Amino acid sequence: MRLFSVATIGLAAVLALSSCAKLKKPSVEKAIDSVNVIDSANLTDIMMTVADPNEAVNYFQRSLQKEPDRIDFTRGLAKSLIRAGRASEAMVVYEKIVADKTVTSQDRVNFAGALIRTNEWKRAEAQLNKVPPTYETYQRYRLAAMIADSNKAWKKSDSFYEIAAGMTTKPAGVLNNWGYSKLTRGDFAAAEKLFLEAISYDKKMFTAKNNLVLARASQRKYTLPVIQLTQTERAKLLHTMAISAIKQGDVDIARGLLADAIDTSPRYFDAAVRTLAALNNS
């Protein structure tokens, strides 16, 4: 009787374990699937942000061959093509995205950015016009400002640049763009202030430094501004000032600036040497 009870208990235990195994297996598989989805999402984010742009393009192209209906992969491909400097190819991909029923306002903003990179200003404006006014982002206003610039709608441009600058903790880029807009309008004093502000946020931004010197030279301020500069940067900016001085007829000042650029540069400054030689032989 005792043997029968033990056998019965043993059999019950085996059946119970078997039932548990049957119950747990799908749960384990579901858990693994969830992990795979998370890993895939993380990998997609990595590819779109920090991975080598061309590697990211290859990754999304391979992924779309396996799963052509994945709109997130299509978005990833478009963004990666932009990062890789292949805006013309990205435009083709964005055409598919904005034609999809899941298109978002951000998709249209991204498409507008790609269109601007290929000088398709009117098409870019058309895409932004399809974005509802309630969708307010830094990127949207930055692009709107650039489009307003292209239309010479200066009041709109200034308004959009100001809004964009207030919507980011890193406004150096948009302030530099705004300054360049002022520079092209001939408002050199305002441009100078904006370039200085841009540099205050990013002390290594050479484009803003060069633009600052252009704005100052346009006002015949032929001295370097009090900003952080390397020797190489100092030499390049002196050369920039010299070129501006030549264009404004201040040839003697240009000679002095070129001589300073040659003396300041830690390496042989061929461009400055050739420009000075041309001036002296003219």
What is each model feature region?
Residues 71-72, 104-106, 136-139, 171-173, ...:
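Helix-start (N-cap) detector for alpha-helical repeat units in TPR-like alpha-solenoids
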Residues 66, 99-101, 131-135, 166-167, ...:
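Structural marker of alpha-solenoid helical repeat scaffolds
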Residues 20-76, 83-88, 92:
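N-terminal leader/linker segments that initiate helical-solenoid repeat arrays
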